[in-house]
A protein has these predicted regions:
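Non-transmembrane, membrane-proximal soluble domains of secreted or membrane proteins
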Residues: 1-179
């Protein structure tokens, strides 16, 4: 699962399952359905299988965010131009919640994370449905993400060079960008 932080929502990519992508935004209070949690539920939940080791790759499109899901013991920064990695294994079906745990701007408090853990069979059914649902939405998300990845490569070179020397002139690291 690839996770991309944005001001102020998350994008999720499933590269091992057809590479479909969707955005997950907080559900406004006046649109909540019975059983949905205020400030915690999203319009689209991440769906993951129980009992499987899952690689989580995280980055950001704009500023520093933090993808935090306490029940998984995960709290990892999403950094523009960098891909951070961790692994999880969910052992029990259910819905798990988290939030952006890094102050990232004015609407930081409205970046919930909602994950639904399901059986392997239900996950496969969901993937089949999601591949169709998210492939049929032609909103330009995939091209924007491809462009973002190119911009991130360029930004990484710039960031590596600009942060190699502190304001008082101390050299912290040698930039290897472009070598």
């Amino acid at each position: 699962l690839k996770i991309i932080g944005h001001q102020w929502y998350w994008s999720y990519e499933y590269p091992d399952h057809g590479n479909f992508t969707f955005d997950a935004n907080m559900i406004p209070e006046d649109e909540l359905k019975p059983g949905q949690k205020r400030l915690m539920d999203t319009d689209y939940r991440v769906v993951l299988p129980v009992g499987k080791k899952i690689q989580l790759l995280m980055t950001s499109d704009d500023v520093l965010h933090n993808w935090g899901v306490p029940s998984f013991g995960v709290k990892l920064d999403t950094v523009p131009g960098r891909l951070n990695e961790t692994w999880v294994q969910i052992n029990k079906s259910g819905v798990y919640y988290g939030v952006c745990s890094e102050l990232c701007g004015g609407n930081h408090a409205y970046m919930p994370i909602a994950i639904e853990a399901v059986s392997e069979a239900d996950f496969k059914k969901w993937v089949t449905k999601a591949q169709t649902e998210f492939a049929s939405v032609d909103d330009g998300v995939a091209p924007k993400l491809a462009a973002t990845e190119k911009v991130d490569e360029d930004a990484t070179a710039s960031v590596n060079a600009s942060f190699a020397i502190t304001p008082n002139g101390i050299r912290l690291a040698q930039s290897t960008a472009g070598q």
